[in-house]
Amino acid sequence: MNDTVTRLQADLCVVGTGIAALNALAVASEYLEQGQQVVLIEQRAQYGGMWNDAYPFVRLHQPHELFTAGSIPWQGDRPRSYLATRQEILDHFANILDFVRARVRVDERYGWEFTEHEERDGRVLVRARNADGEQLEVDAAKLIKGFGVEVRPDTPLKFTSDHVRSIGPSTIVERRDEVYNGKEPIWIVGAGKTAMDTAHLLVTEAPGREVNMIIGGGTFFGKRDRLFPNNRWRVQATPNMLQAAVARRFDGTNEEDVRRWLREKYGIGLVPEAKNYFFGILSEAENETIARGLTSTVRGYLADVRDQDGRPELVLRSGVTREVPAGTWIVNCTGLITPVGRPYEPYSSPSGNVLTLSLRSATVLLSSFMAYFMTHLMYRDLLTTTPLYQVDYSELAKVAKPASPYVMATIAQYNLCLLSDVLPLRSFLDCGLDFDRWMPLPHRVAAVAAFAARRKRDGARMRAALDTTRDRFGVRCGPLEFV
C-alpha cells in the first residue's frame, strides 16, 4: 500500500469535470475573489466527463450555444443552429476552464478518484486516491460533487450464442471496414438518441446495408424543427415552454394522457405509439432518413441470442424468435443513462457546505441546469433555507419509468417558481443554458411575464402533483428534512 499523502488547502473543491461540474465551477468562480484557490478532482485523464466516453459520432441535441457553463460563450463563427461534435464539445470545455482560470487559481488533479469527505470545524475534508494508491486530502471551505447523470460507456451485450458479433456504437468506427462492407445484417438494440444516431450513421454512410432496429416500446422525441426553428421569430414552443406545459398537465396519476398529448402535439419518432420519452430532440429530416434507410423495425425487447440447431436466433422477451445469419452484428444502444448504484445523498448537507449534484436527489430537469442554479443558492447561503423539492430519480425510474419524465418536468418547473423568489433576475438572464435564448428578446420578455403571472397558481398545482407521486410510488419526493 502506498502511504504517500498530498495535503492541499482550498476555498472550494469540485469533483468532476463534466457539464454539471463545470457549471458549478463557472458559477462559483463568479462569487470567489481573484486569487482564491479551487481544487478540481477528476478520475479520468482529462476534463470532459461522459464526453470522453461517448461514441465518436455523437452530436448535441440542441444548438451548440445553449450547451455551456454559466454564461461562457463558444468560440468560432458556426451558425447558431449548429450541432457540435464530441471533439468540439471537449474543445469548448477547455475554453470554459480557461475562463475560470482567469478568475481564480485552479489546481487540476486528473487521474484521482474521489473516495469520501467529512465535515468538521466548519470545513470539509475531501479524500481521493489515484491508480498508484497515493492519497490526496483537500481541506476546503466548500465541496461540490458534480456527479451529474454519470452516463455509462457503451458496452456490448452478452449472449448465449457466440455466433453473432456483439458490439457498442464506438466499435462501428473502430471496425469501420468490417461493419460497412460486410454482408451480414446489422441489428441495433434500442430506440433512444444513441440508437437513432447509430442508425443515421449506418444508413447514410453504408447505404444498401441491411440495418434493423429492435425498439422496445418505442421512443419519441421533441421536434427540433418546431422547438428550434431556423426563423427564430416563428418559435411557437421552446423546450422551456414544453416543460411548463407538461408540468401544468401532469397531476401525479395521468402520465399516459400526458404522453399521448405530448406525442401528438410535439413528438416525432419511428412509430406512432411510442411509449418512451427522455427529452431528446430530433429533426424531421433525420427521422425520415432513418425510417427510409432501415430494413425493418421490430417492437419488443431483446432477451438473448441463442443457437438453435447450430444457427443463431434472436429471442425477444415475449418469446418470439427470429433466425439470423452467423456473423450478424448486434449493436447495443441501451442502458447508457441507466442510473448507477450510487447510494442516496441529499443535494445539500445540513451545513450547506457540501452540494451533491446527482440523480439520487434531483431538483431540476438537466444536471447542467441543476448545477447552475444550486451553486447560486450555495454561494448566497440559500441552499438549506429554500424549500426545493427533490426526487430520487434513480428509484423513480425503477418503479415508475412511464411517469418519470413528467415527474422530472414538474419538479423542475415547481422549483423554478421557488428559485425565482430568492435569486435575482440577473441569475436567470445570465444562464447560457437557457433554451429561451433561441427566441428574440421580445419573445423572451413575454415568456418571463407569462411565467410570473402563473407561478403562484401553477406552483400549488405542481406541488400537489409531486405529493401524489410520492404517495403513489413510495419514492423520495419532497423537501429535505432539515429545510
Tell what function each PLM region has.
Residues Q43-N95, E174-R176, I214-K275:
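Glycine-rich active-site loop/strand segments that organize a redox cofactor
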Residues C13-V15, L136-V151, I186-V189, P325-I337:
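Short hydrophobic core segments
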Residues P79, T85-H92, K145-A206, V211, ...:
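Glycine-rich dinucleotide-binding loop and its adjacent helix/turn
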Residues M1-L12, E30-Q36, L136, V149-V179, ...:
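Extreme N-terminal leader/targeting segments of oxidoreductases
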Residues G48, H200, A291, S296-R299, ...:
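Glycine-enriched catalytic-core subsegment of oxygenase/oxidase enzymes
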Residues G18-Y31, R175-G222, L365-L418:
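Rossmann-like dinucleotide/flavin-binding elements
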